[in-house]
């Protein structure tokens, strides 16, 4: 399997490049933020306070995430349900920010992201993707940009 990691600072255009490149190559683009949103959604649906690290950690063994490319678009599945639209609600974004602060969630998603890279051709972007998440990526790109036109 081929894995491409795009690292760089906020605002450098990582996501725009990653989505376009994944589409051109026919690879799955892994939106790591959507994964955090999915865990936030699960916590909200379970009635768990997303700020409660222990309660959220107790949910993790019940969560199965999968990312699939359908008709050229990424879809994220939470325990078999396509939650691609549901995770975009404002309250779920707030829950995602809360769960992302928990080390157990970060470890869980790190394992999940690496598992995805072992099972399909993927392209991931974000901070620390090439150094922490996919240190052995087939291709690593560090993207920078300036505010100048």
Regions found by a protein language model. Give the residues of each.
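Hydrophobic anchor at the beta1->P-loop junction of P-loop NTPases
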Residues: 6
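P-loop (Walker A) phosphate-binding loop of NTP-binding proteins
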Residues: 9
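ATP-binding Walker
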Residues: 12
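Walker A/P-loop
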Residues: 15
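Post-Walker A helix-loop "phosphate-sensing" segment adjacent to the P-loop in P-loop NTPases
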Residues: 22-31, 45-49
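ATP-dependent small-molecule kinase phosphotransfer cores
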Residues: 34-121, 131-133, 148-149
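Conserved phosphate-donor/acceptor-positioning beta-strand/loop module used by diverse small-molecule
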Residues: 135-149
């Amino acid at each position: 399997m081929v894995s491409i990691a795009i690292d760089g600072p906020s605002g450098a255009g990582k996501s725009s490049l990653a989505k376009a490149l994944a589409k051109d190559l026919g690879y799955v683009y892994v939106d790591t933020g959507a994964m955090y949103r999915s865990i936030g959604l699960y916590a909200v649906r379970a009635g768990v306070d997303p700020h409660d690290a222990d309660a959220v950690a107790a949910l993790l063994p019940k969560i199965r995430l999968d990312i699939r490319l359908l008709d050229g678009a990424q879809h994220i599945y939470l325990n078999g349900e396509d939650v691609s639209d549901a995770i975009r609600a404002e309250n779920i974004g707030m829950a995602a920010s809360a769960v992302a602060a928990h080390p157990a969630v970060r470890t869980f998603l790190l394992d999940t992201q690496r598992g995805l890279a072992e099972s399909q051709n993927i392209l991931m972007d974000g901070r620390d993707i090439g150094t922490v998440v996919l240190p052995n990526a087939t291709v690593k790109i560090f993207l920078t940009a300036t505010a100048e036109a």
